[in-house]
């Protein structure tokens, strides 16, 4: 993982266009090929990012001489720019990062992460819900448990009665962190044209009021699971709010 703290401005060029004006930011380059831009707020959420696979081309501004500058460079206001980083994904979308000054540039090999280990109840809830997917509603079907994504596995990926994709996040005690996690998964999965549109279900034995409010505000359905009933019968009880 490479962490660069720099004064930079960023332009996203693709289906939409977005611009971040010059400011001090953290640029995070992970071993999986992802690139994300962070400010000193917003908790863990990046200002902009590019999911893997993508390529990174870094060019010194001093190497350009008049007409030799690439189109990506000449299109940008580049006074005082030291480097231009061009991050491109297979669809041709780009992050164009103009570096004015680098304050810190460090790289660390974190090795392979063992991943999040769920407690026994959460793991069993996931297993039981996958076996009794109709708890989520009539006509639901299971696509896969632990559906892999670039930011971690989705507990359960399913289809509803209309065939639409539904991502399910399972917790023993559902808090705001779980809703944020589901939000990240749904945002990422909706970028996949084969899965979109993707909605979310937040399922837990107990859902905290603040988490329920946030989940519903983001369009997620909340399901309270009866663990004892799920363990003891083929058809589990639940409460929908």
From Swiss-Prot:
Location within or outside the cell: Cytoplasm
Family the UniProt entry places it in: Belongs to the NucS endonuclease family.
Cystine pairings recorded for this chain: none
Highest taxon in the source lineage: Bacteria
Species in which this protein is naturally found: Corynebacterium jeikeium (strain K411)
GO molecular function: DNA binding; single-stranded DNA endodeoxyribonuclease activity
Entry keyword set: Cytoplasm, DNA-binding, Endonuclease, Hydrolase, Nuclease
Gene label: nucS
InterPro entries according to UniProt: Endonuclease_NucS, NucS_C, NucS_N, NucS_N_sf, tRNA_endonuc-like_dom_sf
The protein's enzyme class: hydrolase
Main localisation: cytoplasm
Keyword Nuclease appears in the UniProt entry: yes
Job of this protein: Cleaves both 3' and 5' ssDNA extremities of branched DNA structures.
One Pfam family, short name: NucS_C
A single GO cellular-component term on record: cytoplasm
UniProt KW Hydrolase keyword: yes
Protein name: Endonuclease NucS
Annotated EC: 3.1.-.-
């Amino acid at each position: 993982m490479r962490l660069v703290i720099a004064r930079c401005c960023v332009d996203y060029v693709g289906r939409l266009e977005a611009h971040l004006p010059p400011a001090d930011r953290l640029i995070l380059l992970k071993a999986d090929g992802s690139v994300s831009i962070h400010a000193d707020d917003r908790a863990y959420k990046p200002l902009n990012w590019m999911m893997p696979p993508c390529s990174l081309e870094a060019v010194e501004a001093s190497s350009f001489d008049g007409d030799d500058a690439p189109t990506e460079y000449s299109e940008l206001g580049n006074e005082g720019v030291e480097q231009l980083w061009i991050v491109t994904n297979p669809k041709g979308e780009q992050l164009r990062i103009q570096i004015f000054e680098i304050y810190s540039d460090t790289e660390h090999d974190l090795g392979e992460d063992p991943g999040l280990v769920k407690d026994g109840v959460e793991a069993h809830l996931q297993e039981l819900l996958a076996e009794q997917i109709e708890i989520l509603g009539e006509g639901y079907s299971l696509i896969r448990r632990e559906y892999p994504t670039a930011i971690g596995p989705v507990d359960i990926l399913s289809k509803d009665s209309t065939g639409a994709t539904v991502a399910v996040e399972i917790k023993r005690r559902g808090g705001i962190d779980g809703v944020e996690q589901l939000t990240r998964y749904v945002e990422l999965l909706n970028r996949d044209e084969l899965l979109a549109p993707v909605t979310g279900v937040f399922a837990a034995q107990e859902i905290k009021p603040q988490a329920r409010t946030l989940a519903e505000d983001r369009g997620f359905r909340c399901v309270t699971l009866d663990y004892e009933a799920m363990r003891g019968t083929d058809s589990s009880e639940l409460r929908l709010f």
